[in-house]
Swiss-Prot record:
Family classification: Belongs to the universal ribosomal protein uL16 family.
Assembly with partners or alone: Part of the 50S ribosomal subunit.
Residues spanning the membrane: none
InterPro entries noted in UniProt: Ribosomal_uL16 (IPR047873), Ribosomal_uL16_bact-type (IPR000114), Ribosomal_uL16_CS (IPR020798), Ribosomal_uL16_dom (IPR016180), Ribosomal_uL16_sf (IPR036920)
PROSITE patterns per record: RIBOSOMAL_L16_1, RIBOSOMAL_L16_2
GO biological process, one term: translation
Secretion signal span: none
Coiled coil residues, start to end: none
Name the UniProt record assigns to this protein: Large ribosomal subunit protein uL16
Keywords: Ribonucleoprotein, Ribosomal protein, RNA-binding, rRNA-binding, tRNA-binding
Species in which this protein is naturally found: Chlamydia caviae (strain ATCC VR-813 / DSM 19441 / 03DC25 / GPIC)
Amino acid sequence: MLMPKRTKFRKQQKGQFAGLSKGATFVDFGEFGMQTLERGWVTSRQIEACRVAINRYLKRKGKVWIRVFPDKSVTKKPAETRMGKGKGAPDHWVAVVRPGRILFEVANVSREDAQDALRRAAAKLGIRTRFVKRVERV
């Protein structure tokens, strides 16, 4: 699982989802990528499941880049606990994604293989995504 080595504070507030992605909106490293169409949280388990799905489909061909990192802690209170008594303990880590964010990039494979691999990975996520290819920027 991906998680930060250390953070300044153990617990975080929920934050806002408004707006579009501020960065990582273009395919910069590979030839093809997976871009988000919705906003939401992507957990470290979902990122790992996507990585495994892509690598299993490509069978050591090509190269994969993960463009998101789960740096936000999500807390959870124990089961059957009454309300109040403070915020729960950190439970898992998520990456906040907004529309336009590139999640994964793939290189050195055919378009069909990249599309199939990223489609399998997209099935592991709880948000809508689309397949994009690299465009030359000036």
